[in-house]
Amino acid sequence: QSALEEAFQTSSPRHKRNAVRAVFAFIDGCHNFVRSHVNSQASAYKHLYSLSDLAVLREESPYVDERGNVKTRQLKVPLITSIKALLKLLEKNNVAKHEVDLTHSGFFALAKAIEIRNRVVHPKNAKELDLSENDMQLVAQAFNWYLAFALRISYASNEALETLINSFKK
């Protein structure tokens, strides 16, 4: 969180932009971990999930090439859509209980923070590089919400895997 703290302690536009980039680098990396965690849980409970469900968790899309070979290509799912999909997929397993609230202001802040990140990373003009205090507050709120989300989902999928492992011990 030091990039965020540094951005709030200074009015430097460069520090603010670096903080936005750092937050989303963390979120992107963490989301890959969370998705793979849910994929492990889903793979252990395969009877609850369709092949499409498992493909989405692996971010793969099957296709047939011009020679008739079945192949897969990478599927890029936007972060907000991916979060919703992970929650729906976890809900298929009643053992993997979570308490994630998509009506929480932090989730809405995440959607706004993604717009801010996109504006900073792909500016259409120099003005789009300017970040207000409100922008930084939204990014901080998004970071906090995502961190709580990742911890809750990881815990839920861990619990589901632990329940399955314990069922084999009986």
Regions inferred by a protein language model and the residue ranges of each:
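Long amphipathic alpha-helical segments
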Residues: S40, D130, L151-K170
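Flexible secondary-structure boundary motifs
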Residues: A42-R119, P123, K127, W145-Y155
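Short secondary-structure subsegments characteristic of cysteine-rich extracellular domains
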Residues: N134-A150
